[in-house]
Amino acid sequence: MAFQHGLSGLNAASKNLDVIGHNIANANTTGFKASRAEFADMVASAIGGAGGSNVGIGVQVAAVAQQFTQGNLTVTGNTLDVAINGSGFFMLQQPDGSSAYTRAGNFKLDKDGDLKTNSGARVLGYPIDPATGLRTATVPGPLNFPSSQPIAAKQTTTVTAAFNLDARAYDAAGVPATPGPPPTPAIPPTPRATYGTSINVFDSQGVAVPVTLYFQKTATDNEWEVYDSLDTAATPVGTITFDNNGAITGPVAPAPATGFGLTLSVDPSPPNPNNLPAFNVLVNLDDVTQFGSKFAVSDLSQDGYASGELTGINIEASGMIMARYSNGMTRAEGQVALANFRNPQGLMAVGNNNWVETFESGQPVMGTPTDGNFGALRSGALEDSNVDLTAELVNMMTAQRTYQANA
């Protein structure tokens, strides 16, 4: 019986050393989760014997339990390196079509625009409609970003302006001289206060057209004339009015727009080699004020842009994948999917930093980052192995002494 005790102790200690050695070997493996050997005693059973007469016959390894604690995050600066801060697993489609799960987010784009792991598995997520930002599928599929798809130019339809016109400005006609007695000198007219600001708008082919807006005080209280200039000549386009509190009262924007605004007619020429027609641009004036402070522009933006080529992608904390284009635009192209399990320790490790589901793990619960109990993503970072190297070295020495004691 003593031989059985020692042999079981050797086997258990050897298995423990295997587990510890595997942990130490993967101390620098991205997304690796350490394991722990768990032991149970063995007892010889006697039919009909009294409980106190059972004799222990040694030890056995009851389980090798994976430890899914969070690993540290290391910043890499690579936008396709993604770490999960919290619970969840990236969902993968392996080359043979089967499903796998991983915590290692060191992804790559292949020549076809597929987002893949180092082992060639495709990363799964949800396709997004760029126009609405909403999902177009309920089941995750392989994420793909073909580099050959440029973003088309968009003609400007609206300019949004926010600025203050100085309420202290006025337009005085002046006073002529009088002969007296006593004579009074002439008071010259005060120059009309004029302010201006410029912005580029885009025609239907994405060509930038510079537009300058001028605002000139009239002789009427709380009233300003508006001019636009596409070249050198200024063209009147309307009048802005305010109440005594400095809030804009007109003009009312043309339908179907609401609020306050003016319409500009923008002629792409010159130069205009393709003879594009003039197009209208609504200038939204809802946030224009007339207070007793200097003229200042706080916002001047427009909704058009030139065409652009894909230059890269960013992955947000929510898993939303934003494509970056050479024209400065960004567009939602997909969303990374995550999965979780009722019993993550029931997952089976299959190598290449991957796990597959088993009966013990339960079926995956799918979702997206920051949704419910799922963790957030951090682009430009990777999750380190959660192996505590110091603790593992101590465990190894203890396991070696145990092995020696049973030899």
What are the residue ranges of the model-derived segments?
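Amphipathic alpha-helical coiled-coil segments and their boundaries
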Residues: 3-6, 392, 399
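Amphipathic alpha-helical coiled-coil segments
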Residues: 10-13, 17, 389, 396, ...
